[in-house]
Amino acid sequence: MKQNALLLKKIELPRTPAEWLEAVMNFLFFLCGILAVGCVVLISVYMIASGVPAIRKIGLFRFLFGTEWASTAADPKYGILPFILSSVYGTLGATLIGVPVGLLTAVFLSKAAGPRVRTVVVTAIELLSGIPSVVFGLLGMQVLVPAVARAFGKASGACLLSAIVVLAIMILPSIVSVSVTALNAVPPEYEQGSLALGATDTETWFKISVPAAKSGIAAGIVLGIGRAIGEAMAVMMVAGNSPNMPDSLFRSVTFLTTAIAKEMSYASGLQKQALFSIALVLFVFIMLINVVLNVVLKGGDRDER
């Protein structure tokens, strides 16, 4: 009884309107957090429930490491290794192009560009981020694909290379915008101290500012990778959409996302279940990328401390 009385004394109801408003806002923040977590949990449960049955029927090894996809054949095959490798190679290639270009652009905008140039470039990047995926795909199909075919003497330019270039352009706004914000947040004392010790502007930017902003820059890279690996429409218009192994940059390929988009409208039975399994694999990939990058960043922060 005494313990209950003490607990009741500790729980004090808000008295003033400001305290009531604070209590209501705290409850709303808590509710929004629970809602966000609940959405992730529901999506995860739905993906697992929809994707696991096909994997059980097909077999995990045959599904993940099979090299042939023929879902509408008389004897259907459900091997998604070509899709996995195409997505990995495409995302990796786009990252290798987009990250250096995006980071250098962010450093330029944050540290070197004049006000007028910064305004023009930032406006262009904001416009680029607002362009729909289908427009990127249309431009790639009409301009990039024929250019690749002519430049390399190929019958068709719809291939892995075209997809990589389009994805690299599409991830630039995410990387640049977040990186600029992170670089602008670096305390000016860091740079002033470096310059006072005799370092050049370039040395200060890349040895002081960029390492100090690495968490924010990494967040931009994660957003870019997420956009690249999850893109479907633009890739479907420039990659060729043939379920081939990506053994060449000029090979017509199918990504995990485009396999789903291409067949889901008419799929049924085991074929539809297999497409949900592909979505589950894609979901796991994105989660693993986020976890690995978070672990690496936290490890780097602990080492610095």
Please place each PLM-identified region on the residue numbering.
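Transmembrane alpha-helices
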Residues: V178-S179, L183, D201-M237
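Cytoplasmic-entry segments and transmembrane alpha-helices of multi-pass inner-membrane transporters
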Residues: V101-G140, E304-R305
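C-terminal transmembrane helix and the adjacent membrane-cytosol boundary/short C-terminal tail
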Residues: V180-N184, P188, L195, K262-R305
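Generic hydrophobic transmembrane alpha-helix motif, especially the helices
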Residues: E126-I171
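Interhelical loop and adjacent transmembrane-helix boundary motif
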Residues: R150, V235-F283
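Transmembrane alpha-helical segments of polytopic membrane transport and secretion proteins
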Residues: M1-C32, L293-R305
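Transmembrane alpha-helix signature in integral membrane proteins
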Residues: I80-F108
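Amphipathic cytosolic juxtamembrane alpha-helices at the membrane-cytosol interface
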Residues: E22, V101, G114-T119, P187-P188, ...
